[in-house]
Amino acid sequence: MKFVFCFSLLLACSAGISITSAQAADGQANVVCNFSHMKPDDAIMMPDMPGMAMSHDFMGNRSTDAFSTAETLLQRSGTTCNNGADSTGYWIPTMKLPDGEIVHPTYIKTYYQAYNVGQYPVTGYPHGLQLLAGDHRGNSPNPHISFLCANGNGYTNKANQICGLRSKGDAVQFNIGIMFPDCWDGKNLKARGTKNAVYSDNEGQCPADHPVKLPKVNMNVAYVLPQITSLDVSKVELSLDPQLVDGELTPLWGSIYTAHGDFMNGWTEDATRFMADHCMNFAMECSTNIPYSFTEAVADTYVSNQTEADTNFGHATTLLVQDDWRNSGRNINKQILTLIKFKIPPQPTNIEDYTGVSFKYKIRLYEGNITDAKAFTIFFYPTTPDGWDENTVTWNNKPSFKYSSDASLYMNNTQQFRYVDVDSAVRAALAAGKTEVAYYIGGERNGRTISVNSRESGKTPTMMLVGYQKVVEP
């Protein structure tokens, strides 16, 4: 059985079409997951009771069943989601069309969102967190459940639409939006019987008895139905808990107003921490750039030649880059190089579970041209991570390097986070038995100055291991 939650805020986003909302998110990330499997299981409401729950459609973790726990989701972490860091179990009741056909979601697109983070910052999801949304006994509109016809006028709480063919003319697309609560009580990880989470108010503030604000899970379930040309939403049915009669289970069905969703957190701990501390709380649109694992720079500084050749800049909050190869060349002109070191983030120990997922190493920096409005390329030159300290290194005692780059980054004068692919170089370092890598960042060779935020600034340079696989959104 499901517990009934009554809440007050609706913010709905579409999967596969434009987003509509009552309030724009400050920070946001998203994940797209294909349908995985159907089972009459529910690990939140009927744990360890296989076959006893209503029929559910599962997305995300491929192994989710009645016995799933936070531990098993990470141990058997194969996922249908495009972000390899997300092995969450997402599930919803199975749908039946008016003609009796059972259909499954084509995909879900889930937005992770935060509001008013300057005043009310979010915390990463705790390991083992479960969330519920909606009412499986519902018979009227719910403020946290919404419906959309792709050929219509956006999301509505009322089931009074008749969906026609979407703009492509190839199928009826019907979406269900499910908004999960975002204020946790800080104690109860399990949702069954605890009311462990409620919704923040319109300002993004959580109540005193549920003080821990989390990124809001805004799940959008898309059914792409090429076999029909019209759908009366009021006649759609969803599975209910079966009835036990004479020792046999009889399936039951309810109206579309019984729509609800279950969430069992399967993000890696690094991913949830990054989502909160390095994305949402910076009011960023991070899209799919939520890493499986990451490390923050363990050392960063810059070195400068000529009159500053013996000066150390280890405590600088802003690092500088300047490179001028004109006229007499770089050794005569002013030159400033940023020096940065990372521990290499760990890869999955169960990599065989991640069929289809491509993992790549990236560096994320907050930087920009501070000389003029020009756009240009900067370069990442490998150097040794050993034998230098950010608090003592200067131009005159800096580690050696060659002007042969492992990576480059095209950038302009906008100060923002940027990502650079260093996958090949980091994998070569791993193959050589290294656990750390270090880089000089060199300029565009025409004398312009670039600023890079250091680890002392709050916008810490990070090295990320990002896993991605293509998910079809027809």
Residue ranges and their predicted role:
Residues 25-53, 57-178, 186-290:
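Primary mode marks residue(s) on the alpha4-beta5-alpha5 output face of response regulator receiver
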Residues 340-342, 352-370, 464:
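A short beta-strand element within beta-rich, extracytoplasmic domains
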Residues 12-21:
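C-terminal segment of classical bacterial N-terminal signal peptides
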Residues 428-456, 470:
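Ser/Thr/Pro-rich, low-complexity mucin-like regions
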Residues 332-334, 346-359, 429-430:
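Extracellular/lumenal carbohydrate-interaction signature centered on repeated Trp-anchored short motifs
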